Structures are given as C-alpha cells and as structure tokens.
Regions:
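Short, non-helical or kinked segments that cap or interrupt transmembrane helices
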Residues: 30-38, 96-106, 135-143
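Interfacial segments of multi-pass membrane proteins
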Residues: 45-48, 71-75, 104-133, 145-150
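Hydrophobic alpha-helical transmembrane segments
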Residues: 4-9, 53-54, 79-84, 108, ...
Length: 150
C-alpha cells in the first residue's frame, strides 16, 4: 500500500503542468499552440518571456526534488518508484490528456536528488553540447547518454 501511495502522490506532483499554467495565467496563451506545442521550459522560452521560461524550468525541477528528497530520507528503498512516477507524471499528465513535456527539467531534478554529481555531469554536458550545436533537444539526448558512461 505504501508503494502505491508514494507512486500516486509522486505522479500527481509530477503532473503539475507549470509551463501550461504559467503561460495561461500570465500571458493568457495556451503554450500548446506556440512553437513546438510542448509544455516544457524550452518551448515556454519561445514565448519571449524569459522570466516565465526560467520559472517553468525551476518549478519543473522542484516538482521532482520535493517528493524525491522526502522519500530519500523517509523511505530510502522507494526512491526509484518516486523518481519514475514524478517523471511519468510530467511526460503524461492526467490534467492535459496525458500529453506533457519531454521531462528534461524533471530528469535534472531527479538526478540531483539521487546523486548530485550526476546532476552536474548532465548540466555540464548539456551546456557544452548546446554551445556547439545550438539545439536544446540534441543537448538533452546526448547529455543523458553521459550519465551511464560516468
């Protein structure tokens, strides 16, 4: 029962669509009709509002950090259940008919909670790749590959 509760709460926290909510409340626009149609921070930046873009990034990271750190210090053996559930909540949010973001910011929050070194490896790899390629999506994919290599 404990596993189901942790998975459900983590999923629900992960499914909070901050990019959608912030652009709807502050810009009166539906982020799903802008740029790539994705609700994540990269697409929110395409609205031209950097504050909302970086707020989305911060909140998408935070929505992973809060439940995972709680689980890490109270139910250590269930941390990966919480991490997977938060990630799935972001990618498949019940509130938006299971069409969410790509999960990159949420993944960063997960990495920092599980092992902060992995979080830094991802961030540094992402920045280096982005400086060369100028593509956020490519940077995210290749930086993710750096994690198992490390």
């Amino acid at each position: 029962m404990e596993i189901i509760f942790i998975a459900l709460v983590s999923y629900l926290l992960g499914s909070i669509p901050f990019g959608f909510l912030l652009t709807k409340l502050l810009l009166k626009q539906d982020i799903r009709n802008i740029g790539s149609g994705n609700i994540g921070a990269t697409n929110v930046l395409r609205t031209g509002n950097k504050l909302i873009g970086f707020s989305t990034l911060f909140l998408d990271i935070l929505k992973a950090v809060i439940p995972i750190l709680f689980i890490k210090y109270n139910f250590q053996n269930l941390i990966f259940i919480s991490a997977l559930s938060v990630f799935l909540g972001h990618v498949f949010p019940i509130w938006l008919k299971f069409k969410g973001g790509k999960g990159v910011a949420t993944y960063v929050g997960i990495l920092f909670c599980i092992n902060y070194i992995l979080g830094f490896v991802f961030i540094i790899s992402w920045f280096i790749i982005f400086l060369v390629s100028k593509y956020s999506s490519l940077s995210s994919l290749l930086a993710s590959l750096a994690i198992p290599i490390y």
